[in-house]
Swiss-Prot record:
Function, as annotated: Catalyzes the desaturation of acyl-CoAs to 2-trans-enoyl-CoAs.
Gene: ACX3.2
GO terms classed as biological process: fatty acid beta-oxidation
One Gene Ontology molecular-function label: FAD binding
Protein name: Putative acyl-coenzyme A oxidase 3.2, peroxisomal
Length: 675
């Protein structure tokens, strides 16, 4: 280094040390004021009565819901933490898998002590079932691991005993299950078979000399897999197994097997292993079970559908094996109902957090030296959240309608419940996952923190798209049911009745060529276009299958060939069913602000569903100009729903403590003083 360079550096350093700073050229300059949190409630007014909207959305048992929210907020078991000047309750996801499992069980016993589960199995009737649904939904808002464990114990194990069993089983098991003396699990899924229940490989035989059934896992693919509660806590299992009688396979049957003693030791001839860590739901102890010729009493066959007498004679009032299989699966519909319902409450939670955050968080300014703009005032942000909000509203009405049909079910409605619950379960759980992803992105990096809930919920709820039936398979089930109904009515020359197909008895709707704003928002137009879409796809699907069937191919193979048309049809059926529930709810309301806002929500649901489905354009029912009109109207509706955004999420009725810090004063929650 040259001497001149060294001298120059020394001179610069001396100036830094010895000289005073130059006076500012702008002596009046003051530091900019830091960002201040402003609660959305200060700037956003409610344009309708929130309590009335909540009654519509929750549908039933509001007092019981609020009672349970309060119970959870009162106990340290629910991990209360102060953030940003208020208390939040949510699970601690920093706990190990084993800690999460144990705390979930402690929470269950706390709720048991408080009487939350009273009557869940021993009381009957629509009111008792609706109360159970309501309390179950609240548990899921706190933690899906908690509600999943309850679902396994009450809705799978408990309902199996209740609906597959008879008096002898009810007297022995139901009260002890309700009191958690017996802890149950539901062993249906296997390593090699899940949605295809018919293919289950576990085999049960009967020994008439001892009057015992013998359950066996014949190969590794037959091990029971993903069995909730099996890894740690369950002491009894419902075992779904093939029943082999004297070399004849009688198909799927349902048995009770003890897998642990009351001290928690694994029973002889049973092996249990842990499924391990998961992407979510680590408070649920999923396990694997092998049966090595496990012997159980003859009375442990749940015999409402079929029985084996002491001498080994097989008896059933249902002679047809396919009908008998259907009878075994029918009681499982409640699982799809609760999954659909919990998916919507999860979407509500994500939207409440994301929309509240977008009403206080600002970014960029649209004018020189202007104030930064609220996120939800950007049309792009409205477009990403408000259509999902409208869909969540529509699906809330749909799932409430499904629950009412389910609790008032009759043998005549069982088929419709099975079909509708399959479609709703698939569409609503897909909607939930899409909503949570959009909400995670909409809150930026804050969505990565588990305390803010939105991002973590994705891992918790992802399982819903595949358990209790893979969504794609369920959608195929819907289209097959519609196909069978269509063919049956045409063959018998009878009018359509049931599954919402009555509109096909009327002339084919004719859509206007010009779609004005008032036309697009007209409920009759919306219903007509949804009916036309379903009708056209059903006719196309049946025509395609019938044409190819005439060439000698099997119907099942042809369903597979036409899977895309099949999925379009089942989506059209389900979305039309959802729209109808909103129309029904709207029709019951008196004129007023609640009805007006619900009309906007309904129009948004209808039009965004049309915008996202290319089948109407593909088959020529809407022109390219029509599709452009729909797109523009969705954007207009975003602007009209924007002033109601806070009130719409407030109507979810979720207490502040169950949301997250970024839904409130996120500046204070992240301040140094809050550490």
């Amino acid at each position: 280094m040259s001497e001149n360079v060294e001298l120059r550096r020394a001179h610069i350093l001396a100036n830094h040390i010895l000289r005073s700073p130059r006076p500012s050229s702008n002596p009046s300059l003051t530091p900019e004021v830091c960002f201040q949190y402003s609660p959305p409630e200060l700037n956003e007014s409610y344009g309708f009565e929130v309590k009335e909207m909540r009654k519509l959305l929750d549908g039933h048992n509001l007092e019981e819901r609020d009672w349970l929210y309060g119970l959870m907020m009162q106990s340290n078991l629910f991990n209360p933490k102060q953030r940003g000047g208020q208390i939040f309750v949510s699970p601690d996801y920093n706990q190990t898998m084993e800690q999460q499992r144990q705390i979930s069980m402690k929470r269950i016993f706390y709720l048991l002590e408080k009487g939350v589960f009273q009557g869940w199995l021993t009381e009957t009737g629509p009111e008792a079932e609706l109360k159970k649904f309501a309390l179950y939904e609240v548990c899921g808002i706190y933690d899906y691991s908690l509600s999943a464990k309850l679902g396994v114990h009450f809705l799978l194990w408990g309902n199996a005993v209740k609906f597959f069993g008879t008096k002898r089983h009810h007297e022995k098991w139901l009260k002890d299950t309700e009191d958690y003396v017996v802890k149950g699990c539901f062993a249906m899924t296997e390593l090699g078979h899940g949605t295809n229940v018919r293919g289950i490989e576990t085999v049960t035989t009967y020994d008439p000399t001892t009057e015992e059934f013998v359950i066996n896992t014949p190969c590794e693919s037959a091990q029971k897999y993903w069995i909730g509660e099996a890894a740690n806590h369950a002491n009894h299992a419902i075992v779904i197994s093939q029943l082999s009688m004297n070399g004849t396979n009688q198909g799927i049957h349902v048995f009770i097997a003890q897998i642990r003693d009351h001290d928690g030791n694994t029973c002889p001839n049973v092996r249990i292993a842990d499924c391990g860590h998961k992407i979510g739901l680590n408070g649920v102890d999923n396990g694997r079970i092998w049966f090595d010729n496990l012997r159980i009493p003859r009375e442990n066959l749940l015999n409402s559908v079929a029985d084996v007498l002491a001498d080994g004679k097989y008896v059933s009032s249902i002679k047809d094996p396919d009908q008998r299989f259907g009878a075994f699966l029918a009681p499982l519909t409640s699982g799809r109902v609760t999954i659909a319902s919990s998916a919507i409450y999860s979407a509500k939670l994500g939207l409440a957090v994301a929309i509240r955050y977008s009403l206080s968080r600002r970014a960029f300014s649209v004018a020189a030296n202007g104030p930064e703009v609220l996120l939800l005032d950007y049309p792009s942000h409205q477009r990403r959240l408000l259509p999902l909000l409208a869909k969540t509203y529509a699906m809330s009405f749909a799932v409430n309608d499904l629950k009412m049909i389910y609790v008032k079910r009759t043998p005549e409605t069982n088929k419709a419940i099975h079909v509708v619950s399959s479609g709703f379960k698939a569409v609503l759980t897909w909607h939930n996952m899409r909503t949570l992803q959009e909400c995670r992105e909409a809150v930026g990096g804050q969505g990565l923190k588990t305390e803010n809930r939105v991002g973590h919920l994705k891992g918790e709820y992802d399982v819903q798209t595949t358990f209790e039936g893979d969504n794609n398979v369920l959608m195929q089930l819907v289209s097959k049911a519609l196909f069978a109904e269509y063919v049956s009515c045409k063959k018998r020359n009878k009018p359509f009745k049931g599954l919402g197909l009555e509109h096909m008895n009327s002339p084919r709707p004719v859509l206007p060529t010009q779609l004005t704003s008032s036309t697009l928002r007209c409920s009759q137009f919306q219903k007509s276009v949804f009916c036309l879409r379903e009708r056209d796809l059903l006719e196309r699907f049946t025509s395609e299958v019938a044409e190819l069937q005439g060439r000698g191919e099997s119907r099942e193979f042809l369903f597979l060939l036409n899977h895309q048309l099949s999925e379009d049809l089942s989506k059209a059926f389900t979305e039309k069913a959802i729209l109808q529930t909103v129309l029904d709810a709207e029709a019951k309301l008196p004129p007023g602000s609640v009805k007006d806002v619900l009309g906007l929500v309904r129009s948004m649901y209808a039009l965004i569903s049309l915008e996202e489905d290319p089948s109407l354009l593909r088959y020529g029912h809407l022109s390219r100009d029509n599709v452009g009109d729909v797109r523009k109207e969705v954007s207009k509706l975003c602007g009209e729903l924007r002033p109601h955004a806070l009130a719409l999420v407030a109507s979810f009725g979720i207490p502040d403590a169950f949301l997250s810090p970024i839904a409130f004063n996120w500046v204070e929650a992240n301040a140094w003083s809050s550490l």
